[in-house]
Amino acid sequence: MRKDVYNFIRDYWHSWFPKLPSYQAFCRRLNNLVPAFQALAEIWSGMLCAQFEESVQYIIDSCPIILAKQSRSGSAKVAKDFCDKSYNSSRQEYYYGVKLHSLVIRRASSLPVAETLMLSKASVFDLTAAKMMFLNTPPAHRGWLLADKAYCDSEWADTLRTEHGIKIVTPRRQKKGDTLKSGDAYSTAVSLRRQPIESFFNWINSKFHIQTASFVRSSTGLLFHVFANIAAAMLFKLFNS
């Protein structure tokens, strides 16, 4: 994306930017703007979430941001302070990178709105990251939290209910010898209610290619890739909501 922007400015708007630096200097200056993109993403996300009533349906999940995959995942060393190697079960492959954890608000007949987003190393468990998210940035609304089985934890469920007024709903864990069909139907219903977050991840990836980061060469470059794209996504939704 940065290369395309740079080439477009150089080819079509150079008279407006006669002192356009080299591409390397251009990238360094963009990397210095990471805190600004972080702040803009938070501001625009807050503006989108302000429209909701006091009680909402949250959905929580994560998606991988991949710097290297398969055979190259074991030897990758870029941004080691943020990245590591893990296995992605949905893609059935090992990758080196980070996870983007997302707490979104479900909307009828529309893409959900992200209230909280957090980066972690790829190997961090989703439940561990979720606890950190709620501790560092308490949710702005009460209501329900739709999650998958990775978030099942009775102690955390009690904390959500007593401290945040949120009841977590997950697919039922099948017990040994349990053949109740109603349990399967319940789990299917929960999964269907969670489907919008998959649509959210697919949308942000198709529009902004956030999950593809093989071109990243530094920690600041990774942060720029993530937060500049998140800010762009929030701004896009703000003008199209």
Which positions does each model-derived feature cover?
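Short alpha-helical elements
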Residues: 1-241
